Amino acid sequence: DVYKRQEKELPYFAATLTAYLRESHPELLSDKHFIAERSDHAAQTYERAVRNGNSVYEALELSNAVLYQDLRFSKYDAIFEVVSEWFPEIVARQRTAFCLKLLPVCEEAFEMYDLTDDFESSPSYKNLLLELTGLIQTHIERHGIQ
């Protein structure tokens, strides 16, 4: 029965999305509406693809495109990369909280770029990392690492 199958698929997509958000977009983790809506859309895409004769692999590929749309590039991951590489004084156990605190601080750098899903592979990505390094250094000089 299609309805029962979709009921089972929704928790899979919600769990998958939640795990991804925890790693790359922790600022979105509390947005239960977003998670439910995106997961539901992915489950519907999967169900529709299977019903239309696509293989399970193809259906998962289509549903993952929906699930991760506009989430491939992560501001948090970019900040985390800079902090991990250039600021060893931020110990591993403090990095997540520190990087979350830096999201609003670094927003001015992010606004200068077109942050598409494939931005990380663009030449501009290195420029962004340089901008972030400067902003983070200035923030630490003014406010410390608390």
Language-model-detected regions and their locations in the chain:
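Short, small-residue-biased leader/transition segments that mark boundaries at the very start
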Residues: 1-3
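Contiguous interface-forming segments/domains that mediate binding rather than catalysis
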Residues: 16-19, 26, 34, 90-95, ...
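Long, low-complexity acidic/proline-rich regions
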Residues: 96-146
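Long, charge-patterned amphipathic interaction tracts in eukaryotic proteins
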Residues: 70-115
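Charged, low-complexity interaction regions
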Residues: 27-29, 53, 91-92, 115-122
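Acidic, low-complexity proline/glycine-rich segments
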Residues: 5-9
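N-terminal interaction modules that seed assembly of large macromolecular complexes
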Residues: 10-66
